């Protein structure tokens, strides 16, 4: 009898600590099934970059962010490729057509333009973002090289990174 009670106790104790699972689908929560990156920010929010928008999950509900024509505070492009939060809490979104900084206080996006040497905005495909030890961010683009970004002061400063390898290797 003692053995039976022990087995029942273990069964119910294990069941009580089991993880609940939930399947998120395009039909209900996600903007697209082609997921490029899943990122958990320092505040616990889960961000999901897809081919058709950016999805934010706060543990209770989803919010979907998409490009809105004529709205400079929306995503610059729906094809979100990469996400990154730096050590100071700046949250960056890299899309098929450029780089943006998310402001959680206003729930809006601000474009960080990358310019050719001629001064023309290149609308670069952002492929990766990482932080250097000195706090600068390296922005990898597809076919346009690597750029260094400083997020100090009121306006971000971005310039071509000086690396010991040619940018066409990136």
Region spans (language model):
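Carboxylate-rich, polar loop motifs that coordinate divalent cations or form catalytic acidic clusters
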Residues: 1-170
């Amino acid at each position: 009898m003692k053995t039976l009670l022990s087995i029942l106790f273990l069964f119910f104790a294990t069941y009580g600590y089991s993880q609940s699972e939930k399947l998120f689908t395009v039909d209900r929560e996600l903007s697209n099934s082609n997921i490029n990156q899943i990122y958990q920010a320092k505040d616990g929010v889960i961000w999901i970059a897809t081919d058709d928008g950016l999805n934010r999950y706060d543990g209770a509900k989803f919010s979907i962010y998409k490009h809105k024509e004529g709205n400079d505070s929306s995503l610059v492009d729906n094809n979100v490729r990469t996400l990154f939060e730096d050590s100071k809490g700046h949250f960056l979104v890299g899309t098929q057509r450029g780089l943006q900084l998310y402001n959680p206080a206003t729930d809006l996006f601000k474009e960080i333009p990358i310019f050719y040497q001629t001064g023309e905005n290149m609308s670069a495909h952002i492929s990766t973002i990482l932080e250097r030890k000195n706090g600068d961010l390296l922005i990898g683009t597809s076919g346009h090289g690597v750029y260094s970004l400083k997020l100090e002061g009121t306006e971000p400063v971005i310039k071509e990174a000086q690396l010991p390898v040619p940018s066409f290797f990136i």
